């Protein structure tokens, strides 16, 4: 795929769905690099709109919008997946710290696993209040090579995710 077109293709495809979460959960939308982890409860993949290597989203398969609506099996699995994903991101040097975000205002339950990178701190500061500005900046300034980096990060995270035999 041509570098210039990757950004437009991912953005256009993601924006063509009423519910991006449902599209990912049903396999109708293929996130950059494909999925990292899938089960009957959740999907772990790169964000299909924001080209930041290591920015992952856990999407529930059921169409609920709140952590409190999840079954025990789902939130236990989510905890394990967050732990493995965070370790993979850090082991690969994609971030030294991450921020987890889950908002109920979204139509579909998802959790952001957002990597903190030096350029983000320098340009925007750190913390949850900066994430929208960082995301907007990444989308507005995205190039095809940014999406290629996201796809490469997904391949590396997937390998690290399954390689790690982490004790819980």
Predicted regions and their residues:
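HIT superfamily nucleotide-processing domains
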Residues: 1-168
């Amino acid at each position: 795929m041509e570098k210039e077109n990757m950004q437009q293709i991912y953005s256009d495809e993601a924006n063509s769905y009423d519910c991006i979460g449902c599209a990912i959960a049903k396999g109708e939308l293929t996130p950059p690099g494909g999925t990292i982890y899938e089960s009957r409860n959740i999907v772990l993949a790169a964000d299909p709109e924001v080209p930041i290597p290591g920015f992952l989203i856990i999407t529930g398969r059921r169409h609920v919008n709140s952590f409190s609506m999840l079954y025990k099996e789902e939130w236990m699995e989510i905890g394990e997946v967050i732990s493995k994903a965070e370790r993979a991101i850090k082991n690969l040097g994609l971030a030294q710290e991450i921020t987890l975000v889950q908002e109920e205002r979204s139509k579909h339950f998802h959790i952001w696993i957002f990597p903190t990178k030096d350029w983000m701190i320098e340009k925007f500061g750190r913390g949850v209040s900066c994430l929208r500005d960082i995301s907007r900046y990444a989308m507005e300034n995205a190039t095809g090579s940014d999406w290629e980096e996201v796809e490469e990060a997904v391949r590396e995270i997937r390998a690290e995710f399954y390689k790690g035999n982490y004790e819980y």
